[in-house]
Curated annotation (Swiss-Prot):
Organism per entry: Komagataeibacter xylinus (Gluconacetobacter xylinus)
Record protein name field: Phosphoglucomutase
Annotated binding of substrate, by residue: T45, R49, S148, H149, K158, D310, R311, E393, E394, S395
PROSITE patterns the record matches: PGM_PMM
Active site: S148 (phosphoserine intermediate)
Lineage: Bacteria, Pseudomonadati, Pseudomonadota, Alphaproteobacteria, Acetobacterales
Residues the entry annotates as binding Mg(2+): S148, D306, D308, D310
Any one biological process term the GO annotation gives: glucose metabolic process
Catalyzed chemical reaction(s): alpha-D-glucose 1-phosphate = alpha-D-glucose 6-phosphate
Gene name tied to this protein: celB
EC assignment: 5.4.2.2
Family of the protein in this entry: Belongs to the phosphohexose mutase family.
Length: 555
């Protein structure tokens, strides 16, 4: 298990805060070399992330990616507006300027925030879907400049095509390859105008993101029941993009809510340190959430969002910060029992590493379970066409359909998941924490954990490309194995690792995309000791697999 830093959950010493001037200076002065792996564009479903201080998120990265997206749009025939938003990380605004310079030079119609404010990821998804509704041509797409809950020195840039959700690999690989080619060619072929000219360009337009999103919220959450109940709500935007949205929501719907802090500071000095002593706006971490958890008795229900507001953290009174898996299970149970206009065949979307409590809830409410690999992109089609009522990940990211049963967003929306916690509390007269406690009495108590174990790049490749026969296990912690999967049962897509299940427990193992470790997710419905046995057997089986491969290579 990782060792918890002595600084975890405590205010960060001013001496340890990031130097914003140095960060911004490095953005412009450091020139990435695409021959160095760590300095290349690596554009996954969460986009490209890095830091200017490590030459992994700099001006040339953003100019190249923006040109690659302009090229992709042209090739794909995407001619509608590109909705663009930023979060509150220090590198987000300079990256926006770089992107606008390229998009304007390419004649791309771009919609920027009317007030030069911040725009959450779900708001961009909502804007794309709203614009594209009932259109078959001149479709819109979008860009969100955010590294999500990553530390203050990081930047991020992600692309959402016309379906409004995260771009899949068929798009991201094209963008990544083209961007790296531009950098390798010393930026030859990258079109650019000055920032002043970009702002004055007829294709750069101001857009009110706040009003349409806020006005539409009653179509997805029952704002009337929240207001009429008078339930007291605490909200912490964690200094992120949702900071511009909560007051308009409170004013529009008259709910009894308090924003505990509206402070925005690119050093995020108001945060308490995460488990490793780093600042991270992770609303599912009890260490990063110490401020709001400390206020748990002041409100009936409280919640926070990460920096781009695609994730949620629910503080449920005496129960404190809810484990994301627990809240997903409660949200699913509540929604499918209280959305009478949803299609009776709409399913429950979960990832292979999310709690099996969700499986038990889906069975209890008589809904189809759709289990997919890790990544919200796998829920996009289901949410878009209404075959999924809900899609959620154990990392506290989820979205669900409008009350009428049609698509709301195809990206994670931490704002509606927070408001849903208030709706549950208002309608049922009990918090999601109490609802989960009741659920365990009926369906059992799961013991769930994720641990990291070391793995070099060769070992990570072995794990990613496994076949079920290679694992060779017949029992898991004293129970016969029911399934060994390397492809997700919900859609047949590769897990990028494996999942082994028995009656009362399971584990999944998959390599990290960024570090030399692999992750073991495990769960027991018996006890903490049984969970430990599952984790030990999982690690032993994978170590044996690595040893066998090393032996084979040596031979």
């Amino acid at each position: 298990m990782p060792s918890i830093s002595p600084f975890a959950g405590k205010p960060v010493d001013p001496d340890r805060l990031v130097n914003i001037d140095a960060l911004l200076d490095a953005y412009y002065t450091r020139k990435p070399d695409p021959a160095i792996a760590t300095q290349r564009v690596a554009f996954g479903t969460s986009g490209h992330r890095g830091s200017s201080l490590t030459t992994s998120f700099n001006e040339n990265h953003i100019l190249s990616i923006s040109q690659a997206i302009a090229d992709y749009r042209k090739g794909a025939g995407i001619t509608g507006p590109l909705f663009i938003g930023i979060d509150t990380h220090a590198l987000s605004r300079p990256a926006l300027k770089s992107a606008l310079e390229v998009f304007a030079a390419n004649g791309v119609e771009v919609r920027i925030d009317a007030q030069d404010g911040y725009t959450p990821t779900p708001v961009i998804s909502h804007a794309i879907l709203t614009y594209n509704r009932d259109r078959s041509s001149d479709l819109a797409d979008g860009v969100v400049i955010t590294p999500s809950h990553n530390p203050p020195e990081d930047g991020g840039y992600k692309y959402n095509p016309p379906h409004g959700g995260p771009a899949d690999t068929d798009i991201t690989k094209v963008v990544e390859t083209a961007a790296n080619d531009y950098m390798a060619k010393k930026m030859e072929g990258v079109k650019r105008v000055s920032f002043e000219d970009a702002l004055k360009a007829p294709t750069t337009k101001r857009h009110d993101y706040i009003t349409p999103y806020v006005d539409d919220l009653a179509a997805v959450v029952d704002m009337d029941v929240i207001r009429e109940s008078g339930v007291s709500i605490g909200i912490d935007p964690l200094g992120g993009a949702a900071v511009d949205y909560w007051q308009p929501i409170i004013d529009k719907y008259g709910i009894n809510a308090t924003i505990v802090s509206k402070e925005v500071d690119p050093t995020f000095r108001f945060m308490t340190a995460d488990w490793d002593g780093q600042i991270r706006m992770d609303c599912s971490s009890p260490y990063a959430m110490a401020r709001l958890v400390g206020m748990k008795d002041k409100f009936d229900i409280a919640f926070a969002n990460d920096t781009d507001a695609d994730r949620h953290g629910i503080v449920s009174g005496k129960y404190g910060l809810m484990n994301p898996n627990h809240y997903l299970a409660v949200a699913i149970e509540y929604l499918f029992n209280n959305r009478e206009n949803w299609n009776a065949s709409a399913g429950v979307g979960k990832t292979v590493v999310s709690s099996s409590m969700i499986d038990r809830v889906a069975k209890e409410i008589g809904r189809k379970l759709v289990e997919v690999p890790v990544g919200f992109k796998w829920f996009v089609d289901g949410l878009y066409n209404g075959t999924l009522g809900f899609g959620g990940e154990e990392s506290a990211g989820a979205s669900f359909l409008r009350r009428a049963g049609t698509v709301w967003s195809t990206d994670k929306d931490g704002i509606i998941l927070g408001l849903l916690a208030a709706e549950i509390t208002a309608r049922t007269k009990r918090t999601p924490g109490a609802a989960y406690e009741d659920m365990t009495r009926r369906l059992g108590t799961p013991y769930y954990a994720r641990i990291d174990a070391p793995a070099d790049p060769e070992q990570k490749a072995i794990l990613k490309n496994l076949s079920p026969e290679q694992i060779g296990m017949t029992e898991l912690a004293g129970e016969p194995i029911l399934s060994t999967l390397t492809n997700a049962p919900g859609n047949g897509a590769a897990i990028g690792g494996l999942k082994v299940s028995a009656k009362d427990g399971w584990f999944a193992a998959r390599p990290s995309g960024t570090e030399n470790v692999y992750k073991i997710y495990a769960e027991s419905f018996k006890s903490a000791a049984h969970l430990k046995a599952i984790q030990t057997e999982a690690q032993d089986a994978i170590s044996a697999l690595f040893a066998k491969a090393a032996q084979k290579n040596a031979g």
